[in-house]
């Protein structure tokens, strides 16, 4: 095929379950030249008067060039092609708190923003998952008998850690000089970021987006903030979709206010976005610090539709979702909710134009570690 392009932005998404691929050859920023594109099972070959560029597909990914269909040109976006594809299955997602690794080990809790130690050398004898936050509502909706555990919170013992959807519960008595009061914020001593809150005089809740839990003999991992928040939320969504067949979520602050509506499209995508005019790999601007330099241009992704709910936007839709038992709430500090909304907006702006919106929702395409 021949098209007129200059610096061609190449975007490839492979859907593992559907065994299909979407290839987008973007429009040049300015000017243009003749460019011949050849698609082989394992690579894309682009020839121009200035030379030839080959983009190799990741190991385990193969295209079927003869299946090319749905060829169309979208103004402002470029040339779209759909092909059959094969890709190896991705590994199962790793739990946000690996129970088999952490139980029986001494761990330390760090503030993710500045590295300040919040809990030092805590030996965890039990690491247990908590029931869904919707559990009481589900019991009331589907069971003919009352919930015997209604309004009875679970409190961890000194060497316990209970894992919720977006938080950890730990016993706080042995780490504080004075007995904490219930319903007060836990603030980092160094950077003053809210890390969690006290549930009772002996239980502290830490939000997963605010703390890093490491074996005590390990060092604090310096992870860029936007990458960390994105990876935690993406991992939570993948785990909940897999375990509970839940695909709609509300992101709400600790004050109960809904900030974002999320609707998971799929988590089986393999995304590749190099730049054809050079040998180096161009990543999404937001993800440049989240992928190792030698990890290649392909990454597992979760695709999520989102709607912001700040400044009274989508108020009726948010109220409808809050009253729907199939919608799962995820609670974060209010400042992190706003931070996440900014991350989603920046990520959306980096996508090809035709992929940024679906009906009234916007698209978030996040790197998902496995």
From Swiss-Prot:
Name of one Pfam family that matches: HECT_2
Keyword vocabulary terms for this entry: Acetylation, Cytoplasm, Metal-binding, Transferase, Ubl conjugation, Ubl conjugation pathway, Zinc
InterPro entries assigned to the protein according to its UniProt record, in alphabetical order: UBQ-conj_enz_E2-bd_prot
Pathway: Protein modification; protein ubiquitination
Chain segments carrying region Interaction with UBE2C: 214-236
Compartmental location: Cytoplasm
Transmembrane segments annotated in the record for this chain: none
Residue ranges annotated as motif BRAT1-like motif: 129-159
Signal peptide positions (record): none
GO-annotated molecular function: cyclin binding; ubiquitin conjugating enzyme binding; ubiquitin protein ligase activity; ubiquitin-like protein conjugating enzyme binding
Any single GO BP term: protein monoubiquitination
Modification after translation, per record: Ubiquitinated by UBCH10 (E2 ubiquitin-conjugating enzyme).
Reactions the enzyme catalyzes: S-ubiquitinyl-[E2 ubiquitin-conjugating enzyme]-L-cysteine + [acceptor protein]-L-lysine = [E2 ubiquitin-conjugating enzyme]-L-cysteine + N(6)-ubiquitinyl-[acceptor protein]-L-lysine
Residues with the N-acetylalanine modification: 2
Presence of keyword Amino-acid biosynthesis: no
Domain of life, per lineage: Eukaryota
Region of interest: HECT-like: 332-368
GO cellular component: cytosol; nucleus; ubiquitin ligase complex
Binding site for Zn(2+): 144
The enzyme's E.C. designation: 2.3.2.26
Function summary: E3 ubiquitin-protein ligase which accepts ubiquitin from specific E2 ubiquitin-conjugating enzymes, and transfers it to substrates, generally promoting their degradation by the proteasome. Independently of its E3 ubiquitin-protein ligase activity, acts as an inhibitor of CPSF3 endonuclease activity by blocking CPSF3 active site.
Subunit structure, as described in the record: Interacts with UBE2C/UbcH10 (E2 ubiquitin-conjugating enzyme). In vitro, interacts with cyclin-B.
Domain comment quoted from the record: The C-terminal half (AA 188-389) is able to bind cyclin-B and shows a self-ubiquitination activity (mono-, poly, or multi-ubiquitination) in a HECT-like sequence dependent manner.
Protein name: E3 ubiquitin-protein ligase E3D
Species for this entry: Rattus norvegicus (Rat)
Organism taxonomic ancestry: Eukaryota, Metazoa, Chordata, Craniata, Vertebrata
């Amino acid at each position: 095929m021949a098209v007129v392009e200059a610096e061609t932005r190449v975007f490839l998404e492979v859907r593992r379950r559907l065994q299909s691929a979407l290839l987008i050859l973007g429009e040049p920023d300015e000017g243009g030249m003749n460019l011949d594109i050849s698609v082989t099972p394992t690579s894309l070959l682009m020839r121009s008067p200035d030379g030839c560029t080959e983009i190799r597909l990741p190991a385990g990914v193969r295209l079927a060039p003869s299946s090319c269909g749905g060829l169309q040109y979208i103004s402002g976006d470029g040339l779209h092609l759909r092909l059959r594809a094969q890709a190896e299955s991705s590994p199962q997602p790793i739990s946000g708190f690996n129970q088999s690794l952490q139980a029986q080990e001494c761990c330390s809790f760090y503030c993710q923003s500045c590295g300040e130690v919040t809990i030092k050398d805590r030996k965890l004898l039990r690491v247990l998952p908590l029931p869904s936050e919707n559990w009481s509502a589900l019991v009331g909706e589907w069971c003919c008998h009352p919930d015997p555990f209604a309004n009875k919170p679970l409190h961890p013992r000194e060497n316990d850690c209970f894992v919720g959807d977006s938080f950890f519960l730990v016993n706080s008595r042995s780490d504080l000089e004075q007995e904490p009061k219930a319903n007060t914020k836990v603030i980092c001593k160094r950077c003053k970021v809210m890390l969690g809150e006290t549930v009772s005089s002996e239980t502290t809740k830490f939000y997963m987006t605010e703390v890093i839990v490491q074996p005590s003999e390990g060092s604090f991992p310096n992870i860029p903030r936007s990458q960390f928040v994105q990876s935690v939320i993406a991992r939570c969504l993948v785990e909940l979709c897999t375990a509970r067949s839940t695909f709609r979520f509300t992101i709400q602050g600790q004050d109960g206010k809904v900030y974002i509506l999320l609707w998971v499209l799929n988590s089986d995508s393999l995304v590749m976005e190099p730049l054809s005019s050079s040998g180096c790999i161009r990543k999404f601007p937001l993800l440049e610090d989240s992928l190792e330099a030698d990890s290649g241009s392909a990454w597992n992704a979760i695709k999520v539709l989102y709607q912001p709910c700040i400044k009274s936007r989508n108020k009726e839709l948010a109220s409808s979702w809050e009253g729907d038992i199939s919608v799962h709430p995820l609670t974060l500090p209010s400042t992190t909710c706003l931070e996440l909304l900014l991350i989603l907006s920046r990520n959306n702006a980096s996508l090809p134009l035709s992929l940024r919106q679906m009906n009234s929702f916007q698209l978030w395409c996040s790197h998902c570690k496995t």
